[in-house]
Amino acid sequence: MRICIFGAGAIGGFVAAHLARVSGLEVSVVARGAHLAAIRERGLRVVTPLGEFAARVRATDRAEDLGVQDLVFIALKQHQLPAALPALATLLGPDTTVVPPTTGIPYWYFHGLGGAHGGRQVDRLDPGGASWRTLAPERAVGCVYWAASTGLRLLGGHRGDRAGSDPPRRQAAALSDR
């Protein structure tokens, strides 16, 4: 089974890494910039309270190089979706299933509903109906991506105020790393 995760940030990378551990799945990601370079160089690394692992996946910034997929996970923020539709279209065949999570009401929300709002398309959710046409609602599987996290470790960078002083907040931040 060919699976593409379109958007390899925190959520997309997490999903891709776990799927890559399943035998028989051909997992690829569409990423860009520093994420793409890091994935190509080091793979995807997941650290959880139960352990950590690394996974290698095919990574590209050109979706059209991947060909038609059986399953496409869209791991973009909702406002990024319209610009990504042309690239997403290159991954879709007649039997491709799409998993398009969203942080709000999805474009396909009214698809298949009866009553006064059945099949309604809301321009505010899907300007011009582009998502509806490209990612036909009958191929969509609704879901919510959710991963619990209990902490964040700063691995580098500057802290403190712009003046370079050493206020109590900065001292507290430094102590929290120990």
Regions found by a protein language model. Give the residues of each.
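Generic preference for hydrophobic
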Residues: 29, 59-60, 98, 177
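A broad, low-specificity signal marking well-ordered, structured residues that form hydrophobic/aromatic
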Residues: 44, 57-58, 175
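Active-site-adjacent segment of FAD-dependent monooxygenases/related oxidoreductases
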Residues: 49-52, 56
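Rossmann-like NAD(P)(H) cofactor-binding subdomain of soluble oxidoreductases
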Residues: 53, 61-161
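Conserved anion/nucleotide-ligand pocket segment
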Residues: 157, 163-178
